[in-house]
Swiss-Prot record:
Any GO BP annotation: translation
Single annotated GO MF: structural constituent of ribosome
The protein's assembly and partners: Part of the 50S ribosomal subunit. Contacts protein L20.
InterPro entries named in the record: bL21-like, bL21-like_sf, Ribosomal_bL21, Ribosomal_bL21_CS
Protein name: Large ribosomal subunit protein bL21
Keywords: Ribonucleoprotein, Ribosomal protein, RNA-binding, rRNA-binding
Species of the source: Bordetella pertussis (strain Tohama I / ATCC BAA-589 / NCTC 13251)
Role description: This protein binds to 23S rRNA in the presence of protein L20.
Keyword hit for RNA-binding: yes
Organism domain of life: Bacteria
Family statement: Belongs to the bacterial ribosomal protein bL21 family.
């Protein structure tokens, strides 16, 4: 069984037992969370698509860790004007493990 969930403004296709890095969620490590924004649920060749959400569908997950992604470098430059700007950014994430999908 798999599901398409929405969290942090992004959509993820998840299955039971899968590990996933999502946008930061304010929860403690080891805490079980419920993700109720389920866009579709599928099993085998059957697919249930919500309009926009599947009613009654819930994905349960456990928080494994919090961390930060690798640094990306931002470089802005204006030609012939001796203007250069360097900047870096590291995005926070939460690593979760999908425990159960109920539809």
């Amino acid at each position: 069984m798999y599901a398409v969930i929405k969290t942090g403004g992004k959509q993820y296709r998840v299955a039971t037992g899968e590990k996933l890095k999502v946008e930061q969620i304010p929860a403690d490590i080891g805490q079980e969370i419920t993700l109720d924004q389920v866009l579709s649920v599928g099993e085998g060749d059957q697919l249930k698509v919500g309009t926009p959400l599947v009613s009654g569908a819930v994905v349960k997950a456990t928080v494994l860790a919090h961390g930060r992604h690798d640094k990306i470098k931002i470089f802005k430059m204006r030609r012939r004007k001796h203007y250069q700007k360097h900047q870096g950014h590291r995005q926070n994430y939460t690593e979760i493990r999908i425990e159960a999908i109920t539809a």
